[in-house]
Curated annotation (Swiss-Prot):
InterPro entries reported for this sequence: ADDB_N, DNA_helicase_suAddB, DNA_helicase_UvrD-like_C, P-loop_NTPase, PDDEXK-like_dom_sf, PDDEXK_AddAB-type, Restrct_endonuc-II-like
EC number: 3.1.-.-
Cofactor(s) needed for function: Mg(2+); [4Fe-4S] cluster
Family in the record: Belongs to the helicase family. AddB/RexB type 1 subfamily.
Sites where the protein binds [4Fe-4S] cluster: C789, C1108, C1111, C1117
Coiled coil: none
UniProt miscellaneous comment: Despite having conserved helicase domains, this subunit does not have helicase activity.
Pfam family for this entry, one: PDDEXK_1
Cited HAMAP family: AddB_type1
Enzyme class: hydrolase
UniProt gene name: addB
Name of the protein: ATP-dependent helicase/deoxyribonuclease subunit B
Residues at which ATP binds: G8, R9, S10, G11, S12, G13, K14, S15
UniProt keyword list: 4Fe-4S, ATP-binding, DNA damage, DNA repair, DNA-binding, Exonuclease, Helicase, Hydrolase, Iron, Iron-sulfur, Metal-binding, Nuclease, Nucleotide-binding
Length: 1150
């Protein structure tokens, strides 16, 4: 029995010394067992290294073991494992069950029990206690003697942990063994084992051990002939006082504990072997790396004056450019310096954040890589399918759970069918019991508030299809849900789940996917999908065994499965031998790395910030240690280990180190470099530093593998297009691509894109007629949309593309409701012979409230009917309408114009025929529309008509907009109405005005207190009619009998003589006629443009406003002013006089 330490700094050859020693023993033909004990993650690589050094004899004579492998070896020899192992998922399920059982008994954790992640946190503390040999009995003893302590929170936590831990142990002992107890059992069983008697053991790659591992080491020291332990340190402590600031503090603490075993058991302590490091064996080819190893964490330190070549720091603009630089440099190393991909490692302290970037960039650059990280099983389609099938029941068929179930990809429903039913469900707000109601869905597909029109045949067919899809979705789920309703045993629950998976043919679908991945050589996916079915079945088996006859419901089952799947990590096999290793700083495997890239070397990432998380705080851990209960280290102690790990990481490679850091993340937030960077700058004043923050790299640096070089080449050609000179090296690149058939074809295709413009070609007239229909019927508002942007009009009305309808209250729907109520109100008082002068606030509120309620009640499928939470919105609508009707009554009462018609329709079934417009070809276009209100005045001067359009949003009147075709609706209606009346009544009728009324219940803000009457007057002003009025003092007076100065009713100010002021929105009869003639001409032009196939992408822009901001089709047109052909139609606001003058000139030309 003897112990010998082999110590030396990182790279000094400690592992190599072990291999040499093992080789010597083999050559001596010793019959003693030769054991190399290493950490679990290093066992495979250590076996490879041992065989590479010693040869095939190593296989038969020496054995590489980890503590885990050692346990299996001993248990096979002397027994010890009589039950099945419980995995992490099983532990989580058992803990979840125990927490439910102890509900009400726990003091601290009662409210935390059902929180996401708490079960895993609880599992971690139990695992920690087991690794540190802390039993429930020891916790109980602590609690018995801790009554005098004042830390009630710690006592409360430990009391809860004791209850959970003891019940956990009682439950697990009956049928299972927790893997965390393996080493404790191993330490005990080693006493019976003969396997290690007289063995020679080398312990390598450890810097510390858990209490369980120390127990095993102590037993090995008692049994083995000799134990050799390597320690990464510059010098041993050997009983001297330990310096708390020593870089090698964690290692020296380990040495101290092992020496305690030696003294306690009277084990022979041989003279340690110190491996010299001048230079360290690993750094024999690099003076720079050797200097860094000695001085990076040394105080005082020595300076290396020469410019560094083996060590370089790269400052990146962001994370993407950082990984792109890394990829280019790796390509350069392999291509120019003779490195193999397997010689290279990329590590980071934030693998979670970097792995997707590394995957994307390395794939683009053609770099083979292996990410040393287990795949989390909870993202697999099978797991999503199982959990969502339960979630659908537990969340009452809500949208998210149903479509997560459908989109897992395991149901026999086509993707198009899922899209069809998803659109329908979103538009109608379908959820809950409506999914499983027996009657067919009959909510309209032609959405809106007007739900009284008969369904068309096409709609009936669509509804039939939707109901067929619904039944395919719901029938298997309803059957499964009925079978697991209520409280049933885990066995019954899992049996029904398994039967459901079989009926849905899930196992064969998984097999099909595996076959699909095999055809594409996706080894990672093959491995994942092969494991996942066994994982799911194993989870069910453990649940049945763990919970036995305990009753549970579907919600509990879902939570247990969630907890179980969260713990599963699927092991992955490296797909090839020659590949770059991508790993985290904590999982870097011990293999010969020549070139190391450390990415994300930012403050808080490398070294990482240690959070004080978990159940026990640092202070509570300290309290436990003071009473003799050893637990895992606190964050302060772990920080020293982090510094040591940083040293180990930075000294892993033998030839080449590249450290990079971004100055900002993807959100633009500034990132600080790690302290490592500043330390490197101190010991290397002439440190190689590069950056792409200011672009300094030459063209040669941009040439790497074909794909990224091709992309860069295309960028260079764009530069040439702009008139800049192209570097000669790109001509050579061009030749290379032209001599490669694959890339030549790609170049020819892409080069055509240089001539790309955003011009939308004119559509053939024949096709236009097919798209818009042979009958030329359209609304005036559609013509206005054509004026805004011909392309948007084409997509909406030609291609019939619509925004996905979502079940919500939209502005157009509210507008329709409000128009319906105003019309009903108007017709109601007309039918009751109530004059507008008689209407008061009380009458408005009463009528409006009743009518809104009736309208909403009749709106089948309306969102305003869906739940009480929309009551506030309904009340707001009522307030707006009540106030609007009150103001309308005042406006009518203040003048001589009286309503003569409401909702006057132009159309085939309307009050008047469609507005017929003859084109230059002789064809006729029929315009349809509706006037909200027509007011009439008859006096000695004749008959005067004004039309009023109600707007639920804000609408201003602008004569410029009429000129540009953006606001022609009212003039078209006025012209048509005057023409119809004149033709039918055979008398002249004059225009009096075209006006908008904005329905609102405005807030009044004042700096002083005002009376109720003053407030009402302010509201009247805010809701005044906006538009164009006849320039006639009598007509103006007839619209506002009380006008004096500014009118409260119309947008007019009168002078003292009664004439309208210069800034009033007025026009004389001649100007009204001019505008009518111009709009007729404009309509002809717009219709002919449309029918000639004009679909140009030319939205208008007025001041800073453009319709693109509210357009549903911007992703289709890809309007961008930097692309040729993408230009706005600029509109300048003109004064009314200028507009009229422009129109006169245009009309003269015609």
């Amino acid at each position: 029995m003897s112990l010998k330490f082999i110590y030396g700094r990182s790279g000094s050859g400690k592992s190599y010394y072990c291999f040499q020693d093992i080789k010597r023993k083999i050559e001596e033909n010793s019959d003693k067992k030769l054991i190399l004990l290493v950490p679990e993650q290093f066992s495979f690589q250590s076996e490879k290294n041992l065989i590479n050094y010693i040869g095939e004899r190593a296989v038969s004579r020496a054995e590489v073991l980890s503590f885990k492998r050692m346990a299996y070896r001993v248990f096979n020899e002397v027994g010890g494992v009589t039950h099945r192992y419980m995995n992490e998922s099983g532990k989580n399920m058992l803990l979840y069950s125990i927490l439910n059982e102890l509900t009400g008994e726990l003091k601290i954790f009662n409210n935390a029990a059902n929180k996401n992640g708490f079960v895993s946190t609880l599992s971690d503390i139990i695992t920690e206690f087991k690794r540190y040999n802390l039993t429930p009995e020891m916790i109980k003893e602590y609690l018995e003697v801790a009554e005098e302590r004042e830390d009630n929170i710690l006592k409360g936590k430990l009391q809860d942990i004791y209850l959970i831990y003891s019940k956990f142990q009682d439950s697990i002992r009956k049928k299972f063994i927790d893997e965390e107890e393996n080493l404790t059992i191993l330490a005990d069983k080693l006493k019976e084992s003969k396997y290690f008697d007289g063995a020679y053991i080398w312990v390598d790659e450890f810097f510390n051990f858990t209490p369980q591992e120390y127990l095993v080491l102590e037993e090995l020291l008692l049994k083995a002939e000799k134990v050799n332990i390597t320690l990464c340190t510059g010098g041993l402590n050997e009983g001297e006082r330990i310096d708390n600031l020593d870089l090698f503090l964690p290692v020296k603490n380990t040495e101290e504990k092992i020496l305690e075993f030696v003294k306690r058991n009277n084990i022979k302590y041989e003279k340690p072997i110190k491996l010299n490091c001048d230079p360290c064996y690993r750094f024999k080819n690099s003076k720079e790396l050797s200097h860094m190893e000695k001085n990076l964490f040394a105080f005082p330190y020595k300076i290396h004056e020469k410019y560094t070549e083996d060590i370089c720091v790269f400052q990146a603009l962001n994370e993407y450019s950082e990984i792109e630089y890394t990829a280019r440099d790796i390509i350069k190393l392999v291509r120019d310096n003779g490195f193999r991909y397997k010689d290279i490692a990329v590590i980071t302290g934030d693998l979670e954040g970097y792995q997707s970037l590394i995957k994307a960039v390395f794939t683009e650059y053609g770099i083979p890589y292996f990410i040393d990280k287990k795949v989390e099983g909870d993202n697999n389609p099978l797991v999503i399918f199982i959990l969502s099938s339960l979630e659908v029941l537990n969340k009452n068929w809500n949208y998210e759970s149903v479509f997560r179930y459908l989109k897992a990809g395991l149901v026999d429903i086509k993707r198009e069918e899922i899209d069809i039913i998803e659109n329908y469900v979103l538009a109608n707000g379908i959820r809950g019991k409506r999914w499983i109601e027996e009657k067919d869905w009959d909510y309209k597909i032609l959405y809106g508030f007007n739900l009284t029109e008969e369904k068309e045949e096409e709609e009936e067919e669509k509804l039939k299809k939707i109901n067929e899809i619904r039944r395919k979705i719901t029938e298997p789920l309803i059957e499964f849900h009925n079978n697991i309703k209520g409280e049933i045993t885990p066995k019954k629950m899992c049996l029904e789940l398994y039967n459901f998976l079989e009926k849905m043919n899930i196992s064969s679908k998984i097999e099909s996917w595996i076959k699909y991945f095999k055809e594409r050589n996706r080894l990672d996916k093959i491995n994942e999908y092969k494991q996942i079915w066994d994982v799911a079945i194993g989870l069910m088996e453990q649940l049945v065994e763990v919970m036995k006859e305990e009753k549970l419901n579907s919600r509990t089952l879902e939570n247990i499965f969630k907890s179980g799947f969260e713990q599963y990590e699927l092991g992955i096999i490296p797909p090839s031998l020659d590949q770059v290793l991508v790993s985290s700083t904590k999982r870097l495997r011990s293999h010969e790395i020549k070139a190391l890239y450390i990415v994300g070397t930012n403050d808080g990432v490398f070294p990482s910030v240690l959070d004080e998380n978990g159940i026990l705080s640092d202070l509570e851990r300290e309290n436990l240690r003071e009473t003799g209960l050893e637990v895992a280290k606190d964050t302060k102690s772990t920080a020293f280990e982090e510094q040591f790990l940083m040293y180990v990481t930075l000294t892993t490679m033998s030839d080449y180190l590249r450290i990079s850091y971004p100055i900002a993340n993807e959100e633009g937030k500034t990132l600080r470099p790690s302290i490592v960077i500043s330390r490197l700058r101190k010991i290397f004043p002439n440190l190689c530093e590069k950056s792409n923050v200011i672009k300094e790299e030459g063209d040669i640096e941009k040439i790497s593998s074909p794909k990224p070089t091709f992309n860069e080449f295309i960028s260079q050609l764009r530069v040439k297009e702009e008139g800049l000179e192209l570097s000669s090296i790109w001509l050579s690149v061009y030749d290379w691509f032209m001599n490669n058939k694959e890339w030549k074809e790609k170049f020819i295709n892409i080069s055509q894109g240089f001539n790309h413009t955003n011009y939308a070609e004119i559509v053939d007239t024949r096709r236009v007629r097919k798209l818009y229909g042979s009958k030329l019927n359209m609304s005036v508002s559609r013509l206005e949309k054509f004026s805004q942007c011909p392309f948007a009009y084409f997509i909406r009305y030609g291609m019939n593309a619509k925004e996905r309808k979502i079940y919500k209250v939209s502005t157009p729907d509210i507008g329709t409701l409000m128009h319906d109520v105003v019309e009903s109100f108007s017709r109601h008082i007309e039918g009751k012979n109530i004059s507008w002068e008689e209407i008061d606030r009380e009458l408005c509120e009463s009528f409006v409230s009743t009518m809104v309620d009736e309208k909403i009640k009749d709106m089948k499928g309306s969102i305003l009917n869906s739940s009480p939470r929309y009551k506030h919105m309904t009340n707001r609508i009522k307030d707006i309408l009540s106030k609007s009707m009150e103001v309308i009554s005042q406006q009518i009462s203040r003048g001589d114009f009286k309503p003569s018609a409401y909702e006057l329709a132009f159309g085939f079934n309307g009050d008047f025929p469609p507005i017929s417009i003859e084109l230059s070809s002789g064809e006729k276009v029929n315009l349809i529309g509706r006037i909200d209100r027509v007011d009439k005045l008859e006096n000695e001067d004749g008959t005067f008509i004004r039309i009023i359009d109600y707007k639920s949003g804000k609408q201003d009147f602008n004569l410029s907009d009429i000129y540009y075709g953006l606001q022609i609706q009212l003039l078209v209606y006025l012209d048509a109405l005057l023409q119809e009346i004149e033709d039918s009544a055979k008398k002249e009728v004059n225009p009096a005005g075209i006006l908008y009324f904005n329905m609102d219940d405005p807030l009044i803000s004042t700096k002083k207190e005002i009376t109720k009457e003053e407030a009402e007057k302010e509201i009247l002003k805010k809701l005044k009619l906006k538009g164009l009025v006849l320039k006639d003092a009598n007509i103006i007076k007839a619209m506002d009998n009380l006008i004096s100065g500014y009118s409260d009713i119309i947008s007019v100010r009168v002078n003292k003589d009664g004439s309208p002021s210069k800034n009033s929105s007025v026009a004389d009869l001649e100007d009204f006629q001019l505008l009518r003639d111009y709009v007729r001409k404009l309509i002809v032009e717009l219709c002919e443009e449309m029918l000639e196939g004009n679909i140009s992408i030319k939205p208008y822009k007025k001041n800073n406003y453009t319709p693109c901001g509210f357009c549903d089709y911007s992703a289709i047109c890809q309007f961008d002013t930097s692309i040729k052909g993408s230009q706005y139609r600029f509109i300048n606001d003109k004064k009314d006089d200028e507009v009229l003058q422009c129109i006169r000139e245009e009309m003269k030309e015609d």
